[in-house]
Design a protein with these regions (language model features):
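Basic, amphipathic alpha-helical segments enriched in Lys/Arg and hydrophobic/aromatic residues
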Residues: 178, 182, 186-187, 207-270
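Short secondary-structure capping/turn micro-motifs that flank functional sites
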Residues: 58-59, 194, 200-201
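Short hydrophobic/aromatic-enriched beta-strand-loop microsegments
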Residues: 187-195
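Short, charged, surface-exposed secondary-structure boundary motifs
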Residues: 155, 179, 200-207
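Structured core elements
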Residues: 131-133, 143-145, 170, 192, ...
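Polybasic low-complexity intrinsically disordered regions
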Residues: 4-186
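Short secondary-structure boundary segments
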Residues: 173, 195-196, 223
Length: 270
């Protein structure tokens, strides 16, 4: 209410009003312009993109689709199932853009000797991905893209890059590709992307040491995603890529607003 300058005596927008506002943003196709305008305002306040940038992606869950095997096969082929065509109301409730992916996580498994070992597990998740680039100095989101949950993270690096006063770029191993290295080199940027282990080979000692140092910096981006999911409760309950993009973009914008409020109090711009 304070953000909207509403008093206790004022009417608070209901859920339908907020939904319609978001829908108007989607149909007008201006959400990226809105995000860019606020980024320009931040720079005008002295919060320039500084010290390099960190790139990463996070899965944003969406309601699971209960589709038959035939419907799944049709969707994979890019077709609309015949049963959906005959039922427009059903078609309107089906998200044909969200996709399944596997989320990697760590778990502790009990061993025979009573100790616990860390094992890697894969958790199926249905939804979209929020790809972002933040600046290292202020941890503000400077660029973003939204894809289906199955999209390859590394392919989105060019889409989330922004102008920065420094040339360093940090990212995990998924972003270490020849195409990305060539892209960074062409723009005069310095790759701090984690080294990838070659098949059948282990990383060298210097590479392991470099990855540990890079992880300490790269981990800052995890705090952005954690804030969106814990403080905002970010999930996608809309249908389709266009609406999902608006929903996620607004979450990125809202994060920057809250981050600016914190920065203004604790780290005033010079």
């Amino acid at each position: 209410m304070r953000f909207l300058r509403l008093g206790l005596e004022d009417a608070v927008p209901d859920a339908k009003t907020i939904w319609l506002y978001r829908e108007h943003l989607t149909r007008a196709g201006v959400i990226r312009d809105l995000f860019a305008d606020f980024d320009g305002w931040l720079k005008g306040k002295g919060y320039l993109a500084m010290s390099g940038q960190i790139v990463d992606a996070s899965i944003i869950a969406a309601p699971r689709q209960r589709n038959s095997d035939a419907e799944k096969a049709a969707l994979k082929e890019g077709r609309i199932p015949e049963d959906w065509r005959a039922k427009p109301a059903k078609l309107a409730q089906k998200d044909r853009d969200a996709r399944w992916t596997l989320k990697r996580a760590k778990a502790r498994k009990s061993k025979a000797d009573g100790t616990k070992a860390r094992v890697e597990i894969a958790i199926p998740v249905f939804g979209y991905k929020n790809h972002i680039g933040i600046d290292k100095a202020h941890r503000l989101i400077r660029g973003f893209s939204v894809t289906s949950g199955a999209a390859y993270d590394g392919a989105q690096l060019p889409a989330v890059m922004a102008r920065n006063t420094a040339s360093d770029v940090w990212a995990e191993t998924a972003y270490r590709t020849r195409a990305n290295e060539a892209f960074l080199d062409a723009r005069g940027l310095r790759s701090r992307i984690h080294f990838r282990r070659r098949p059948g080979q282990d990383l060298t000692r210097p590479q392991k040491k470099a990855n540990r140092a890079r992880s300490k910096i790269r981990s800052a981006v995890e705090g952005v995603f954690a804030h969106q999911k814990q403080a905002f409760g970010l999930v996608v309950r809309t249908i389709g890529m266009a609406r999902a993009t608006t929903k996620i973009a607004l979450a990125n914008l809202a994060y920057n607003v809250r981050r600016y409020i914190w920065l203004a109090e604790h780290q005033p711009a010079a």
